[in-house]
Amino acid sequence: MLTLSSLDILTYDGQSYNISWDFIATEELITNYEVDIYRSESPVSGISQYEIVESGLSANLYSYVDTSISQLLDIGRPWFYKLGIHDLVTSGITYQPEPAAYLKDEVPDKIFREIVRRKNINLNNSRGSGRDFKIFKRRTWGTHCSVCWDSSLQRTTDSNCTTCSGTGWLNGYYDSLTIRGMKNTSPKLSQINMFGEWKPSDSLLYVLGYPPLKPKDIISDDDNHLWTVVQVRTIERLGYIIEQIVQMALLAQDELLYKQLL
């Protein structure tokens, strides 16, 4: 079975993604393989929450241009890709890579790598203040909810819809991703000023650049409190995200999401 050595996502025009891949050297015939391309808004494991973009491509092509996202490249809306690699001789299939690839997920230089390594050590130090958090990526594309979606207004009419969790899309949130982060419930005034409007119940969350977060994503802490992402500020090097500083708003305990996500 072929094994990916790289899956790169690039964009040159802001209207499409250029997807290119390469395989680890092998004696197998590459003509015995076909490739399917899958896409999702969340880098969840497995393939069930990914949609197929293209199927039956020759593995020997090594690249594909996804133009179907020409209207879906909104700011703060990352897309994650996997390949389904079919062995035409044995009918076997594997899905790679794990985790999924996305735009600008590579390491630009050694300095970037070292900064991320040190921050990762601090977050995972048992003597530090790093904690486990679960991220529920909000769906912003797919099949509209048949219960609450108003096609004229182009929005949901029920924020408490039990079918779509008030998102307007079926299966409104993806499965959870576990990450390490540091929560600050009493930020300094200089930190608050980065975000503007601030409520007493809001908190800051410091996480690394993966997975990239966007407003309205849901975060669960180790006390089973749910928070919604209000704003995200990033620390970058050479255009690549090192760290995300997230303003979170605490959700009331009677919110429907507590029953649906926890």
Name each region found by the language model:
Residues 1-31, 90-109:
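Pro/Thr/Ser/Gly-rich low-complexity, intrinsically disordered linker/stalk tracts
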Residues 32-77, 88-93:
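Recognizes extended acidic, P/S/T-rich segments that occur
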Residues 104-152:
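Active-site-proximal polar cores
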Residues 167-202:
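Short beta-strand/loop turn elements enriched in aromatics
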Residues 218, 225-236:
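Short beta-strand-centered aromatic/proline hotspots
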Residues 234-252:
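Short, solvent-exposed secondary-structure boundary/capping segments
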